[in-house]
Amino acid sequence: MPSIKEKTLHLILRRIAPRLVDLLGHSIQFRFVNTEYPQERAWRGESCIFCFWHNRFLLMPYFYQRVRGKKNICVMASRSRDGEYISDVLKGFGFRVARGSSSRGGDVAVKEMVSLLKSGLDAAVTPDGPRGPRYRVQPGVVLLSQLSAVPIVPVTYDVKGKGRLRSWDRFIVPMPFCRGICMFGEPVWIDGSADEEERKRMRSRLESDMRAMDARAASLLGATPD
């Protein structure tokens, strides 16, 4: 049975953390780039699989609501304690959560997300999470796209002022009241008949696309890419 301390923490994460994330996002002067495709699919009621690096997770709920204008999304979170905390925050935004990762429960989470994608919900995945290596796309997101026949839409952001945690991914913590870029990439479709070699090729392409987006976002800000 959860202790009073644990119950209090879960309550804070669900009710207060989402408001703080929204406040942080609104305080930053963001320029949004290439939002047309995800917005058009939203107007048509079509799903997307949003794909972003683990260290850029913090503001993604804010960006999603700004660009898609809804809360119909399922986010994959690991079965670790950290994943439980992240789940609380996501549920506070009104999002659904599928618990699983490359190391624990991934197959179950993928099946759940495929079903939800086919029913019209969006999905969100960190392809290098939950343990890395940083900026390396793991197989799950490509398989998810293939099984659901829904395109992957890569997303990144960068800000002029930021701190970083001493974690494996060097998690980005944006500073308020600075300038930022939020960028959406071109959709990546995975053919339903793709074999293992083709899936590997598409993983490599997605990884290259996402790193190029990171560099471009940094360049537009006049910052140094990591």
Label for each model-derived stretch:
Residues M1-S27, G92, R96, D107-D226:
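Non-catalytic C-terminal accessory region of glycerolipid acyltransferases
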Residues D22-E46, L59-M60:
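A short, well-structured juxtamembrane/interface segment
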Residues R31-V33, C51, M76, M183-G185:
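Residues in well-ordered beta-strands of folded domains
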Residues T35, F57, G83, D107-V114:
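Short, well-ordered alpha-helical scaffold segments within catalytic/effector domains
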Residues P38-Q39, S87, V141-V142:
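Short amphipathic alpha-helical segments and helix-helix/interface helices
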Residues P38-R41, F63-Y64, M113-S115, F171:
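Short, flexible, glycine/charge-rich loop motifs used to bind or transfer phosphoryl groups or to couple energy/partner
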Residues R44-R104, R164:
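Catalytic core of membrane glycerolipid acyltransferases/transacylases, capturing the structured
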